[in-house]
Structures are given as structure tokens and as C-alpha cells.
Amino acid sequence: MDYSIADRQMSIMDKLGILTDAAKYDVACTSSGNERKGDGTGMGNTIKAGICHSFSGDGRCISLLKILFTNECIYDCKYCVNRCSNDVPRASFTPDEVCRLTIEFYRRNYIEGLFLSSGILYSPDYTMELLYQTLYKLRREYNFQGYIHVKAIPGANQELVRMTGFLADRMSTVSYTHLRAHETR
């Protein structure tokens, strides 16, 4: 099935800024807990979004590109910054854009893997299919062997979730019951 996303005349860097910032609220990765901004005289900025840290099974700390596929969502969950009633800038990647970003960050040694989550675009199945396409392309077309943590989309077809899970090193989810309990529509 061809799932294409309309081009909204937004650069990939603009999308990256919006979708890394929106992903920072997902607690699946760790951060330093420090909120020291870069002052322009030195290096580093601990509050900049985009790179998070996780730990491998053997205890190593690994850097991940932490992004949302989209921050658009059909739901209006009270707890979520990306709820449809929230007035925030919206953006969506294509599977190829996520692949290219991941590969470029990996080649530059900025990351060792990808953390990919998403708002729900059109329907849970539609969004899960886009995540599957992204991981499939990363693994098969781009031969990416780095670490991938993906968030399963609540309410998506279980076969889509299963197929996506085979391409990821780790998969997690928000329970569908939790999601529905916080809806306001």
C-alpha cells in the first residue's frame, strides 16, 4: 500500500526541529536531568532536543536520534502535548526522510541508533504501516545495523505491530486502555 504524506513546503531541518522537540516528552530514554543552556562561549547544550541516551543489554550507554514520525494526531488525550486540540506547529516526515536523517547522523558518529515514536496520523493502522515502511527501508535498503527502539501504535493491527517488531531491537507502547482513558472527544 502506498502511504504518501503531502509535502507542506517545510524543510527537513524545520521538521527535525519540530519533531525532536515534540519527542522530548517521551520518557523512554534518559537524559542528564541538567538544564544548562549553551552560552555561546563553550560547547554543549544539555536542553537541546534530538539526542537521547539509552542502555544496551550489556550496560553500555548508547546515543539515539529521538524523533517523532509526526506530531499530528487524531486523538485529544489530555496528557499529550501533541493532542489534536493543542495549537502547536505540526510536521510529518516521510519514511525516506527518517532513513536519510538516521544514516547521516550515524555516519557522522552522532548516534548509534534511532528512537522512533509518533502521533497518530489518520488511523492507527496507517501510522503503524508508515513506521513499518521506515524500519524496513532502514534495515533492508540502507542496511542499517544500528539499534532501533520503536513505539508501537495503540490500536494498530497486530500483524503490522508484529512485523515492525521483527525489524526493531526494542519495541514499547502506551497501553490502548491508557490512551482511551485520557481522551476528551
Spans of model-derived segments:
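Flexible, acidic/Gly-rich N-terminal and inter-domain linker regions that tether
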Residues: M1-E72
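Active-site beta-loop-alpha junctions enriched in small/polar residues
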Residues: G119-L121, K151-G155, Y176
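Conserved glycine-rich "GG(E/T)P / GGGxP" loop and the immediately following alpha-helix
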Residues: L114-Q133
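Canonical Radical SAM [4Fe-4S] cluster-binding loop centered on the CxxxCxxC motif
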Residues: I67-D96
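Canonical radical SAM enzyme core domain
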Residues: D87-C99, D125-L130, K137-R170
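Conserved small/polar residues in nucleotide/adenosyl-binding loops
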Residues: T177-R185
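Short, charged beta->alpha transition segments
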Residues: L65-I67, D96-R107
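Hydrophobic faces of well-ordered beta-strands that scaffold small-molecule active sites
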Residues: L65, L114, I148-V150, M171-T173
